[in-house]
Amino acid sequence: PDIVTPESLNSEAGIQTLRAGSLGDLAVAMSGSAAGHGATTGLIVMSGLMADEYAYSGTFPTRREADTRNLQDINSDVNTIYGNLHRSRTGAETTVDLLADFGGNPEIESEMQSVTGYAYVMFAETFCGGVPFSKAPADGGELIYGEPLTTEQMFNQAIIWFDQAIANAGSNDKLANLGRVGKARSLLGLGQMDAAAAEVAAIPTDFVYNIEQSDNSRRQENGIYIMSTVRRQFSIADGKGGNGLMFRSSMDPRTPWDGGTEFGQDDITLYYNQLKYDSSNAPVVLASGTEARLIEAEAAANADDATTVEDIHNALRATIGLSDLDLSGISGDDLLLAHFSERAFWLFSTGHRLGDLRRLVDVYGMMPSNVFPWGPYFKGGEYSTNLKFLVPQSESNNPNYVGCLD
């Protein structure tokens, strides 16, 4: 703060600095980084522990809390993710605000509005309701404390930002599609499956928008790679807690791995290394045409249209040489679970799985004990019935803070 002052950002060059900072904060919030004591965990690996993607093979108690879902509101890893998501959001909002003083730049506005929308989505999918969204004035004035929002309100706020992003994208299809996938993802969270499918219908399957990582600094390195391959703390799971998917034993090319011959960082847990991110500069997909097709498939599954679900999935599987699925005779919850299984393999370790499992419970009405890891925990104790990150106690400096609403 003593190097980059609010006054120095109030220029066209400053706007580019703010944009880069917001994208950097989003990258750290999502994938983590090599910086910090023991590196920095991101939402992707921590939410993967809360779900069935990863098992913890390290010694940090805050990360083991996520593996069992037995979280405290003083969990430092969750607090870091929470702060980085908010920093990314407020940086993007400030960028949009300052652009108005320089005649505007619709493409930068669109990208930053989508970044803001994705922050709301990530909070809605992974945290409990009750997250306040405070405003940091562009002139460096006092923080304007936000009111806590329910999960539904967070998804609705995301849609408002994505609508603005789509409108400002103009002829830039990549930015328009980024906003459309984000809006559709929000609509899924609200249970509006047909509207979500309609939103992504025109997106080509080969579309992709990446969160970029780099070897330029430790902060820019891919934290998923650092936490798994380098530090051996996050082991790719297999049938976690009884309900988890077989991410290893399926030998599926979408979840490549190696290992099983040495222990993790804790020296007691056999370690299985993910290979999806094979270097410290491997990018992370934020939105894609593949996700667009999966959204369409979910709408079809919700309508009990097994033929369409099968056609969409087999077209995707053919792109990487996988054999066809046969979903004939499958309906209802079984069809939904077949779809969600495929979706989990395509979107493995991208920050979707916890939100997907919560949607199976909150939108589709399935029992948590039938979809989340459940029962005895492999290091002793039980998996918690909690399904979400808590609003950190650090937010209690906000006079509107109430903890979790839902």
Stretches found by the model and what they are:
Residues G58-T126, Q164-D173, S280-V284, N302, ...:
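Conserved, well-structured interaction surfaces
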Residues M50, F60, I159, G191-T290, ...:
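Hydrophobic-face positions in mid-chain alpha helices that act as interaction patches
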Residues P1-L43, L325, G365-D406:
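Membrane-proximal, proline-rich intrinsically disordered regions
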Residues R19, R89-A92, V96, F155, ...:
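Inward-facing hydrophobic residues that define packing positions of alpha-helical scaffold repeats
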